[in-house]
């Protein structure tokens, strides 16, 4: 049986990003034989360094980037970076703005989020998204102490998309990749165990996910990254870490991001 092709989609906005989601839903409905991984959503992006970090990750994931940035400077940065690096990038706003300008001589006000009421929930979401981007992939372990959740797992256990998805729900989430050769940050010992989530995946499934990842990057040679014996070692190590830090463990095998997030939220509700 032929495996369905998968396209990873990054959605970037300086507001909620609802515009791109509506378009994407309409487009994906026309391709029933393609899997669109739409877990990577980055709303409230208003700093150039945040934007460039996301675009660099998009290159690594061979992703399609959809943008509804209304800020012309940020949009130009994204467009120029994408052109220079061969990144598939679709700007949904500025080509339309340009047509209006040519016809009327009027420029847009470039104010993000004018469709949405600026309430407490909105600003909490902004803060949570910025937090997830800042503390993704163990970049700054001191952020663990301010996190609602700390996600732990070996490579390709959905740590980043889960962080972003949960951030869209207002949770401050950081994550740390578990690599046997890399020492764990000491600050992890100070984190409330009930806030630590350990992510597991069946070895064979994880090997397949990693192989697909390498194939998407044009790398077809076998490496330790996809070697089943090495993956067993990584997962055994992660189980030791989970036990040491008393993490709440979730097996993500064959679960969608939404399903895993539901289980995490259910765990949090039981703590109240």
From Swiss-Prot:
InterPro entries, alphabetized: Kinase-pyrophosphorylase, PPDK_reg
Top-level division of the source organism's lineage: Bacteria
E.C. no: 2.7.11.32, 2.7.4.27
GO MF terms held by the record: ADP binding; ATP binding; phosphotransferase activity, phosphate group as acceptor; protein serine/threonine kinase activity
UniProt keyword terms in alphabetical order: Kinase, Nucleotide-binding, Serine/threonine-protein kinase, Transferase
Positions contributing to ADP binding: 153-160
Reactions performed catalytically: N(tele)-phospho-L-histidyl/L-threonyl-[pyruvate, phosphate dikinase] + ADP = N(tele)-phospho-L-histidyl/O-phospho-L-threonyl-[pyruvate, phosphate dikinase] + AMP + H(+); N(tele)-phospho-L-histidyl/O-phospho-L-threonyl-[pyruvate, phosphate dikinase] + phosphate + H(+) = N(tele)-phospho-L-histidyl/L-threonyl-[pyruvate, phosphate dikinase] + diphosphate
UniProt keyword annotation of ATP-binding present: no
Pfam families from the UniProt entry: Kinase-PPPase
Family: Belongs to the pyruvate, phosphate/water dikinase regulatory protein family. PDRP subfamily.
Function recorded in the entry: Bifunctional serine/threonine kinase and phosphorylase involved in the regulation of the pyruvate, phosphate dikinase (PPDK) by catalyzing its phosphorylation/dephosphorylation.
Protein name per the record: Putative pyruvate, phosphate dikinase regulatory protein
């Amino acid at each position: 049986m032929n495996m369905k092709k998968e396209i990873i989609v990054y959605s970037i906005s300086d507001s909620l990003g609802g515009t791109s989601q509506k378009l994407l839903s309409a487009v994906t409905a026309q391709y029933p034989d393609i899997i669109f991984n739409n877990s990577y959503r980055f709303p409230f992006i208003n700093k150039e360094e945040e934007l460039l970090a996301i675009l660099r990750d998009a290159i690594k994931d061979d992703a399609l980037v959809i943008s509804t940035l209304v800020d012309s400077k940020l949009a130009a940065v994204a467009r120029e970076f994408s052109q220079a690096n061969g990144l598939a990038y679709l700007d949904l706003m500025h080509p339309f703005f340009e047509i209006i300008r040519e016809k009327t001589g009027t420029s847009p006000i470039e104010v993000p989020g004018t469709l949405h009421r600026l309430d407490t929930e909105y600003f909490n979401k902004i803060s949570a998204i910025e937090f997830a981007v800042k503390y993704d992939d163990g970049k700054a372990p001191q952020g663990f102490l301010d996190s609602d959740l700390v996600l732990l797992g070996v490579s390709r256990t959905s740590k980043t998309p889960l962080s972003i998805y949960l951030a869209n729900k207002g949770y401050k989430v950081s994550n740390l990749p578990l690599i046997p050769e890399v020492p764990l940050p000491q600050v992890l010992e100070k984190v409330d165990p009930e806030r630590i989530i350990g992510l597991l995946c069946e070895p064979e499934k994880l090997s397949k996910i990693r192989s697909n990842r390498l194939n998407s990057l044009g790398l077809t040679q076998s490496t330790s990254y996809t070697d089943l014996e090495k993956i067993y070692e990584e997962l055994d190590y992660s189980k030791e870490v989970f036990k040491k830090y008393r993490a709440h463990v979730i097996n993500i095998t064959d679960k969608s991001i939404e399903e895993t997030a539901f289980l995490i939220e259910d765990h949090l509700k039981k703590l109240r």
